[in-house]
């Protein structure tokens, strides 16, 4: 792929006028306290853009707002060439709000002692609550705009709302008003289950769904056809099954991803079959997994989550060859 992402063909994002890259960057780990310094994140974001990615998905709570700040810092002068999607609906626990301004001091200490995210007690992380009230949504969107250094979001999404909240539609009026004010261009729902996704489709103003789809998790695929009929874009996340489709077989404990031992056993057999399929084709399992989701009819953007340059390099070298990225965009554009 060339050095200018404008050379990369795009897909239409549902019935909107947004044109997006087939792969987007999930920014949940951008700015994390357990990772590198901010300049490295900026370089990572800029490099992903140079390699053809123009869709960036973040949220107000990701890295206590640092994810949005780094996106704003990186793309302030290239705002019209990217698609910014953010989310809101969660409330940061007091512990995390307190730690946020201390990140520059804590990051080198954490790196020195080798502390990982998994080693942090829940009492320090705190429990996330939710708020989808008009006041909170407006305050959150305006906060995101400040951090992203922009006057509008291309896409705003409710962040994992319960089905009852989606069903109520109490949030629609607020988001429609913010569309009229020019603060958001489109809005959608990031869903945790199929039921929420199907309910979201009943609201005519919804322009997108974000759902989990992978070789190992296909339940939400039932939303693809009705979304396509309505012209609703679909953003696929967790396409590598939270790492299960990139880790070595010896490193994967499927029980961590499943509700029961029986489900874990079934997915274990599926995983073995997919490993063999990738081997037979002479490609990595990660590439097989990404191709599967990318080529699903109705998927507009396939999110990949990276937080280090070596991860991005490996992804493009092994799993997203340039010719595949361009060819898949061309196929979608023709459909």
Q: Model-derived features: where do they sit?
A:
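Short, well-ordered coil/turn segments that N-cap beta-strands
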Residues: 18-23, 52-55, 78-82, 150-154, ...
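Short, acidic/polar
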Residues: 35-48, 132-148, 191-199
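Alpha-helix-centered segments that form part of catalytic cores
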Residues: 2, 116-143, 147, 282
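Beta/alpha (TIM)-barrel catalytic core signal, keyed to glycine-rich beta->alpha loops juxtaposed to Asp/Glu
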Residues: 2-7, 40, 64, 142, ...
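Acidic/histidine-rich helix-loop elements
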Residues: 27-35, 122, 128-129, 257
